[in-house]
Amino acid sequence: MLGVLLCWCLGASVLLYVLYSWLIPAAVQFNGSLALLWHDVIVERALDSLTRSTRPQRLLKAVKQHATRGDPQSVISAIDHFCRHREWAMNVGDEKGCILDSVVSELNPEKVLELGTYCGYSTVRIARLLPPGARLITLEFNPDYAVIARQVIAWAGIEDKVQLVEGASEDWIPRMKEHFGIETFDLVFLDHWKDHYLPDTKLMEGCGLLRKGTVLLADNVICPGVPDYLEYVRNSRSYKSCYFKSHLEYTRAEDGLEKSVFLG
């Protein structure tokens, strides 16, 4: 009887491992909503409970173990490897990250605003490409994420270009000119709460933070999606927009970036 029970437990354990490691991840690869539910809710909560740590903490540990201090590219590579082979995380990711890189390199901005820091992955991607003297202000609402992001930014050695600010975007955007001495931004990367994309864009317009030629680059416009934002920038005479088709980070589900040039 004991042998039967042990065999049953072993078989059940193997089945659960196969489901967790291969079958379910493979099944949700092409469906963005299911991928987010599986990776960003079910798996994250389970691992948080089992390890008594958070996903950002586990990501930071991987950076410190596998990335070279002071080497931004090695930090990016370490995070990408962690997210593809160990634990998914909602960074912009390697595929869309290349699109972000191309926009930053083409624009060569001196003043950049990032809305939504998370663990600092896109912050590092952007900052490593900025010219000398350039400035990147990144806003993060979640203080726990900000603690991790500061350490990732420091490990990458880009503190001289980055200023991380904790708080809500709607509170900080009106204070940008007075608090940071910023007149306008050359590039704004939107990757925070999706229902904030449109109101924050209108708030930046109203506060005079956008000049003719300012580029707004918005992530996750398909998955989870920002239909109200897309309708606005694609139909407004104040913007010229184009869509870069790609995939939700570290999956094969469709997602993309929307690049919108402010026309004044």
Curated annotation (Swiss-Prot):
Family annotation (Pfam families): Methyltransf_3 (PF01596)
Record-listed E.C. numbers: 2.1.1.6
Binding-site list for substrate: 194, 220, 249
Location (main, coarse): secreted
Record carries keyword Repeat: no
Tissues in which the protein is found: Strongly expressed in eye, diencephalon, spinal cord, hindbrain, liver, kidney and telencephalon. Also detected at very low levels in muscle, spleen, anterior gut and heart. In eye, expressed strongly in retina. In brain, expressed in the central part of the telencephalon, the periventricular gray zone of the optic tectum, the periglomerular nucleus, the olfactory bulb, and the region adjacent to the diencephalic ventricle in the hypothalamus. Expressed in gill, with strongest expression in gill filaments nearest the gill arch, and in esophageal epithelium.
Protein name: Catechol O-methyltransferase B
Primary role: Catalyzes the O-methylation, and thereby the inactivation, of catecholamine neurotransmitters and catechol hormones.
GO MF annotations, alphabetized: catechol O-methyltransferase activity; magnesium ion binding
Cofactor(s) listed: Mg(2+)
Compartments in which it is found: Secreted
Family named by the database record: Belongs to the class I-like SAM-binding methyltransferase superfamily. Cation-dependent O-methyltransferase family.
Signal peptide: 1-29
Keyword Nuclease listed: no
Cellular component GO terms, alphabetical: extracellular region
Species annotation: Danio rerio (Zebrafish)
Keywords from the named record: Catecholamine metabolism, Glycoprotein, Magnesium, Metal-binding, Methyltransferase, Neurotransmitter degradation, S-adenosyl-L-methionine, Secreted, Signal, Transferase
Cofactor note: Binds 1 Mg(2+) ion per subunit.
Binding site for S-adenosyl-L-methionine: 92, 122, 140, 191
Single GO biological process annotation from the record: developmental process
Glycan-modified residues: 31
UniProt superkingdom: Eukaryota
Binding, Mg(2+): 191, 219-220
Reactions it catalyzes: a catechol + S-adenosyl-L-methionine = a guaiacol + S-adenosyl-L-homocysteine + H(+)
